[in-house]
């Protein structure tokens, strides 16, 4: 039987983006070889690199390639030298254009503390000793960041007033809740929903709709937490969480807080999924390490590629349906850390420091 071939649009972007993306491609090709399928990568400009070359952060050629692709592997965009540009020409505008084009309404942020790195976590061992492994499912295209009315106005008496509006429909809540429950069903079957229903009407609706969707998933245990309490419980009992479901605003805060539990943002991937489907009927996902472009170390072979590599594992799982290969990549990352291999950002005495390319090769060699 012929090997299936998957088409991946690769958008390295700026700063360390090209280096870490190359590392991810190395590992993904190793996974494809080990598990009997083919990956075809096509590289296109985005962000500052695209602006420098053609004057726009999201060229038509890149857009068309993303339309054709089964998934999008992204590096990073941005840098200080672009900060003076008009917003629609800044590198980040390319990222937002992609989210809007494919209605990427769900952002997935795995929070996993690898046992060899527990000393790098700011939390005490008695709190994290039992392990930390949960995922935050954040609604990405609604809520207070996009609600109307919004703006700054001057009242008749000269007072200036800033207005933002938290708006969610039941349909918007239901679709992100359903994705959260589906992910929980494939994990440890526990979902924690976060809201401020005690003081916000949007929060009351959020909780009501989550409970309605929960009836479709009787095998998943549901817990509701107020957002301020959720922030505290992440620090008190992080090992108790499995899937945490949150609105755009609360998910933004909580995912950054939770990221610090893991010891390094160089290890943290993310996936954005939505309604768009690829040729295989699976989400045309967008996969991005959270660490940013880090222009101060770009081109020095010092960047940690593990977040980008773990983005590759998420791509295999969510957009290609290759759970076997995804687990193999994740196990290979765990293996290199267990063996004491490190990049500069996570090194400690007694470990071997590898550059970006060497770390990627080390992971690829352990994919089987």
Swiss-Prot record:
UniProt entry keywords in alphabetical sequence:
Amino-acid biosynthesis, Branched-chain amino acid biosynthesis, Cytoplasm, Leucine biosynthesis, Magnesium, Manganese, Metal-binding, NAD, Oxidoreductase
Q: Which cofactor does it need?
A: Mg(2+); Mn(2+)
Where does the chain bind NAD(+)? 79-92, 292-304
Localization terms from the record: Cytoplasm
In the record, biological process GO terms are: L-leucine biosynthetic process
- Main location per the UniProt record: cytoplasm
Reaction equation(s) it catalyzes: (2R,3S)-3-isopropylmalate + NAD(+) = 4-methyl-2-oxopentanoate + CO2 + NADH
Tell me any Pfam family this protein matches: Iso_dh
Top-level taxon of the source organism: Bacteria
**What GO terms are given for molecular function?**
3-isopropylmalate dehydrogenase activity; metal ion binding
**Xref: InterPro entries:** IsoPropMal-DH-like_dom (IPR024084), Isopropylmalate_DH (IPR004429)
Cofactor binding remark:
Binds 1 Mg(2+) or Mn(2+) ion per subunit.
| Enzyme Commission (EC) number | 1.1.1.85
| Site (Important for catalysis) residue list | 145, 196
A cellular component term from Gene Ontology for this protein is: cytosol
UniProt-annotated binding residues for substrate: 99, 109, 138, 228
Which annotated residues bind Mg(2+)?
Answer: 228, 252, 256
- How is the subunit organization of this protein annotated in UniProt? Homodimer.
Q: What does this protein do?
A: Catalyzes the oxidation of 3-carboxy-2-hydroxy-4-methylpentanoate (3-isopropylmalate) to 3-carboxy-4-methyl-2-oxopentanoate. The product decarboxylates to 4-methyl-2 oxopentanoate.
Name it: 3-isopropylmalate dehydrogenase
Q: Which organism is it from?
A: Symbiobacterium thermophilum (strain DSM 24528 / JCM 14929 / IAM 14863 / T)
